[in-house]
From Swiss-Prot:
Gene3D superfamilies: Pseudouridine synthase. It comes from the Bacteria. It holds the Pfam family PseudoU_synth_2. This is tRNA pseudouridine synthase C. It comes from Pasteurella multocida (strain Pm70). It is an enzyme of class 5 (isomerase). Keywords: Isomerase, tRNA processing. One of its GO terms (biological process) is tRNA processing. Its EC number is 5.4.99.26. InterPro entries: PsdUridine_synth_cat_dom_sf (IPR020103), PsdUridine_synth_RluA-like_CS (IPR006224), PsdUridine_synth_RsuA/RluA (IPR006145), RluA_PseudoU_synthase (IPR050188). It catalyses: uridine(65) in tRNA = pseudouridine(65) in tRNA.
């Protein structure tokens, strides 16, 4: 496959990560054969250095450095919360207006990779801003309810905890559609039955940072994939009017 390159200069490269693709090799997913890092390296004929990551089911802007020195400089910006990130998500229920979720999250340990790690750490600070963009009610019967409500929201994380956006939406009782770990399985099944969509509806739409060499502000945006476009069309939302 060929990855969509969103930005490239002598120091950096950014791609639109497809949903379902791992960023790099992991011994926890030994059966996988396609990874963003290896695919991009082969595509441009040059080694790339990861700066941050996106969960496997999440799509959108993914940034790499083209040298270890630039990678270290960019990683510092992420660590110091100098990078602005925004995501689009479709969630269950009506989530309107804007607000801030300030809800600490307990460190999540992997049963295999972290089996010797301490499981008694205090919850870590986790902050997410949200903005309701659009809503719709559809005649999809779920359990005893004859219709289902959905919202398109923009999510802006100010911290980077594991699965932060997915866990914060669950905390608000507005789980992200297609989330098999934190979402509503009945809602996910109904959505797939009526629309054919069966991915996590979470997309990293924008990344803003300071170029570590030129010191210019860089804004990188990623368009949504076909499943997103299909669902937006079914819900009769106008993505072009959303800024």
């Amino acid at each position: 496959m060929t990855l969509e390159i969103l930005y490239q200069d002598p120091y950096l490269i950014a791609v639109n990560k497809p949903a379902g693709m791992l960023v790099h090799r992991s011994w926890l997913d030994r059966h996988e054969t396609q990874f963003v890092m290896q695919t991009l390296r082969d595509q441009i004929g040059q080694h790339v250095y990861p700066i941050h990551r996106l969960d496997r089911p999440t799509s959108g802007v993914l940034l790499f450095a083209l040298s270890s020195e630039v990678a270290n400089l960019l990683c510092l910006q992420f660590e110091n919360k100098q990078v602005q990130k925004s995501y689009l998500a479709i969630v269950r229920g009506y989530l309107v207006g804007e607000g801030r979720i300030d809800y600490p999250l307990k460190v999540q340990l992997d049963k295999i990779a972290d089996k010797f790690a301490q499981d008694d750490k205090a919850p870590q600070e986790a902050v997410t801003d949200y903005l309701g963009l659009a809503k719709v009610e559809m005649p999809y019967c779920v359990k005893k309810y004859p219709t289902t409500r959905y919202s398109l929201v923009r999510l802006i994380p100010h911290t980077g905890r594991k699965h932060q956006l997915r866990r914060h939406m669950k905390h608000l009782f507005h789980p992200i559609l297609g989330d098999t770990q934190y979402g509503d399985l009945h809602q996910n099944r109904a959505l797939t039955t009526h629309t054919g969509v069966q991915r996590l509806m979470l997309h990293a739409e924008r990344l803003i940072f300071t170029h570590p060499i030129t010191q210019q502000q860089i804004t990188i945006c990623a368009g949504v994939d076909q499943q997103w476009l299909d669902l937006i069309n079914i819900f009769d939302w106008d993505l072009n009017s959303i800024h």
